[in-house]
């Protein structure tokens, strides 16, 4: 059990108590929010100041936390792990900015859980893996407690505790810190969430998930100090801009959503609807044809390599997608969606599976993980942005393309430095935006506006 499982235990127990809870996830992750939504019944919202902005993070949290009695944010990595955490230089605390900086003025924990906690003025519950600790637990807790005095460590959850004797040693060690113990989770070898090459297996592929959530709720009912924990989770009234009005639906967008394609930010889908799009969800795995009377297509990321055979065997859909795009229908394809538009996917075993063939290249699975935030500059006018426009996104994949386009969409670099990552992305045909870079449109509402403008032109 790790941070995500502890979070799910909290959410499951709250829902068993019939409490409405809104969950959030720090960072760009897609899969953890799927688990949150499965438990709470509400879309989880990502809080990522790199993909969006600090202001957007504040407004997103304020807007959605007001809708429920309780709010819970799951962090990312360690508390202070941000995109510039590897900068080695003296640290100082810039009280006027509320950010931790080095002697170059760089924020050293930007986009970390600590950064979000400061930005939203939220208390932090520290989850400590105690499986190989006794007295050292106090040193760890004290280190986190004192590292940045602006972070409010409200208490600790002791995770993977062994015997009663082990728990006694941990409690004795923590007494001098006067830090509340808000939960104790014993070692649970029978509670595991399967994972694979890109992290946890998504919820749609776990038939036993409901039984697992029930076990987590049982655990949560007894392992947490709810009397002291519930006040920390209570949603507080926060000022935020009014919800934008929905434009009348004037266009239909086919959104591929099934076991193969399920990496979407709910905020992106909401934006499309607010701008007047009717979203038609469909399955390239199961459907007999693409949806009728649509003026655009949106293929998110996911795991087409896992379902490559089933995608390949659905020839009517493959042919329909290719025909529609070649006839001019605008299409966004991110990562897994990009792979689906290729001629073929070559899986981890070297087997080749035919895809739609819109793009004259193949996606080859491999061991190398490409991961990180990207700054991407558009090299030409394309479906979504004008030449010279800079967008911020992230990559997370274990595939590569056999052919680089002669006129790529973007020149990319790492977000936290000037290291050039090369050119990527297909914008040919001109009505296609196919890229490994995942985008959150909270930073640039102009992107979905431009997409829908092109869809209306096609209509």
How should these model regions be labeled?
Residues 1, 5-85, 105-119, 128-152, ...:
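ATP-dependent carboxylate-amine ligase catalytic core
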Residues 191-240, 365-459:
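Amide-donor transfer/coupling interface in amidating biosynthetic enzymes
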Residues 304-382:
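Cysteine-nucleophile active-site neighborhood
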